[in-house]
Amino acid sequence: MIYILACCAGNVKNANVFIFQMAVWLPGPNRFYLPPQPIQRTLNTEEYVRRTSTFLHAATDRLLTVGHPFYNITNADGKEVVPKVSSNQFRAFRVRFPNPNTFAFCDKSLFNPDKERLVWGIRGIEVSRGQPLGIGVTGNPFFNKFDDAENPYNGINKNNITDQGSDSRLSIAFDPKQTQLLIVGAKPAKGEYWDVAATCENPPLTKADDKCPALELKSSYIEDADMSDIGLGNLNFSTLQRNKSDAPLDIVDSICKYPDYLQMIEELYGDHMFFYVRREALYARHIMQHAGKMDAEQFPTSLYIDSSVEGEKLNSLQRTDRYFMTPSGSLVATEQQLFNRPFWLQRSQGHNNGILWHNEAFVTLVDTTRGTNFTISVPEGDASSYNNSKFFEFLRHTEEFQLAFILQLCKVDLTPENLAYIHTMDPSIIEDWHLAVTSPPNSVLEDHYRYILSIATKCPSKDADDTSTDPYKDLKFWEVDLRDRMTEQLDQTPLGRKFLFQTGITQSSSNKRVSTQSTALTTYRRPTKRRRKA
């Protein structure tokens, strides 16, 4: 409100005073936000997938692998003769299950192929590990250690190193970070790592004299035998540590990946990770310093005060701030084990509640608690007397796995709404179900050569050559085929008996189908005992 005071001209004593009130609109201090545009809602698989009362069990044989714990061994021709097998590697299993739509079920009314399609749903998984608990050791015979930051008197003076221009590399080993990890999904797990970023051309953000490259966070699928983080970070050591002395032998020329949990959790359909369990433990065993030229990034002189005594002045050539620590995985105990125990899937972290659309599951794991490296010695000729040169020393690492699954048979109605949603999510699912999708008419007359591979015709197109529809054909996985290892007799398998006990489901003696009858005990009231008359 605005008030206006008005006075009439004339005698001031007899002046008339008038007050006018006027309303004025002012913009409000609050901002107005328009609602966002509506987006398509992502459905949970429980909204369009119906579960049945049929459960099946599938398990692998004993899966074994043997190799060198630090590097691949090749012969004179460059052919790999001994693979690299380390406890710090990822094990990425690609488990294939049979197509349930081709099953011959005893119950003919189980599903209608004209109106429904069958899919598998994971209800339980157990990853069993053999071999005793043990701590692995990794190291480098030429490790870049300039000084001991914990006890400097055991550093460069003991090694007679006087400046950065010398070679201060030593043979150093340590036990890596302790990691237990299990990721289960319908698609491969994703990992992240740091690598050299591409230089900006227009405009250039880096100067010509810049020595340190820019970093970029990259993401890729976790493949079998990829290295995990051992406590020195997830980065591409082959491009970011060119001296090959700042890391152990098993990762000095490798990429250490860390699971990209943020990206897999935020995935729209939740296929890459149904659930995950992990346990990581480490502490700083030793604190040291790396040697190297520091002219590019020298620590400022304003951060320290030099000595006034001429003989005690700080020698900057022997001082470096490139501190690092050697990790240690600490104690390994059976009470801390995540393996050799079942995991039951009731609700996934994403929208896919354990449905295997392409009849395959991806199991990614790391277990460093069984990292013992075997030392094998073989004599050269007659070894009647001991001499170091008379024995060959070898290193080997072994791993043992077994995977077991409980699968539930599920049905999807072939309604237009379901097919439209599934086609938007993954068109290859519709193709695997052998359902035709009407394509728009094409008025262009195409050419089809009969002898396309002969030298008389043109070269075939790349699309014609690529007949494989596998999206992961270029990735490396541990292939496991369980298409002929399915059984409905849950009470005859270890994981099946655990599942029956946990869920309270009873199995009929005919072993042809599984029923979900309740096993609750019925209590009876004992009748009152009458007192006999005397």
From Swiss-Prot:
Residues 507-534 are annotated as: Disordered. Pfam families: Late_protein_L1 (PF00500). One of its GO terms (biological process) is endocytosis involved in viral entry into host cell. GO terms for molecular function: structural molecule activity. Its main location: virion. Keywords: Capsid protein, Disulfide bond, Host nucleus, Host-virus interaction, Late protein, T=7 icosahedral capsid protein, Viral attachment to host cell, Viral penetration into host cytoplasm, Virion, Virus endocytosis by host, Virus entry into host cell. The keyword Membrane does not apply. Gene3D superfamilies: Major capsid L1 (late) superfamily, Papillomavirus. It comes from the Viruses. The keyword Glycoprotein does not apply. GO terms for cellular component: host cell nucleus; T=7 icosahedral viral capsid. It is found in: Virion; Host nucleus. Residues 507-521 have a biased composition (Polar residues). SUPFAM superfamilies: Group I dsDNA viruses (SSF88648). Forms an icosahedral capsid with a T=7 symmetry and a 50 nm diameter. The capsid is composed of 72 pentamers linked to each other by disulfide bonds and associated with L2 proteins. Binds to heparan sulfate proteoglycans on cell surface of basal layer keratinocytes to provide initial virion attachment. This binding mediates a conformational change in the virus capsid that facilitates efficient infection. The virion enters the host cell via endocytosis. During virus trafficking, L1 protein dissociates from the viral DNA and the genomic DNA is released to the host nucleus. Self-assembles into homopentamers. The capsid has an icosahedral symmetry and consists of 72 capsomers, with each capsomer being a pentamer of L1. Interacts with the minor capsid protein L2; this interaction is necessary for viral genome encapsidation. Interacts with protein E2; this interaction enhances E2-dependent replication and transcription activation. Belongs to the papillomaviridae L1 protein family. This is Major capsid protein L1.
